[in-house]
Amino acid sequence: MSNLKQEKPDSYKTLAIYQKSECIYDVTYHFVNNFLNKSKDRTVDQMVQAARSCKQNIVEGYSDAEGSSESEHKLSVIAKGSLEELKEDYRDYLRNNNLEIWGVNHPKYIAAQPLCKIHNDSEWYRRQIAGRNAEDICNIALIIINQELTMLYGYIKYLNEKFLKEGGIKEQRYKTRLEWRKNNLGY
C-alpha cells in the first residue's frame, strides 16, 4: 500500500509556493487600497481576486492532491493564470501612469530582487512597502509575481513528470489493489 502514501509537508502553510502567494496577496491588497479608487476602478476587485485566486488555488490543490492528482494540476495551472493576469494589471498601471517598469539592470531591481527571493514572510513585505510610492510597490509586486511564476512553472512541470512516472490516483489504486489480490488471494 506504500504506493498510495505520498510524503507531503504537514501543512500547505510550510510550502514556499504558498508563502510567496500570501505575500503577493498582501502587497496587492495594500496597493489597491492605497493607490486605486475603489469606487471608480473595477481593477481593484480584479487585482485582489487574481491575487486571492492564486493563493486559494494553491491551498485547494494541495488539499485535493490526496484524492486527485488531476485536480492538483488543474488548480496549479489556474493559480498560474491568475498570476499572469495580475502581472499584466501591475504593468498596465505603471504604463498608464507613466511610471517606470524596472528592468533587470535597474538599480532598484538589482537591490530588491535578491531580497524578495529570500523572503516569504508577508509581514516582511508589509513593513517594506509601508510609505513607499506606487512605482516601487508595483515593481516589487512584479518581482515577487515573477518569482512565484517560476516556482509554479517548476511545480507544474514536476506534477507532469510525476504523472508520467506514477500515473494518477486511480491508476495507483488499481495497481495497489492488484498487488493486494496477488499477495492475499493468489491471483
Regions picked out by a protein language model, each given a short descriptive name:
Residues 1-187:
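Amphipathic alpha-helical assembly/interaction segments
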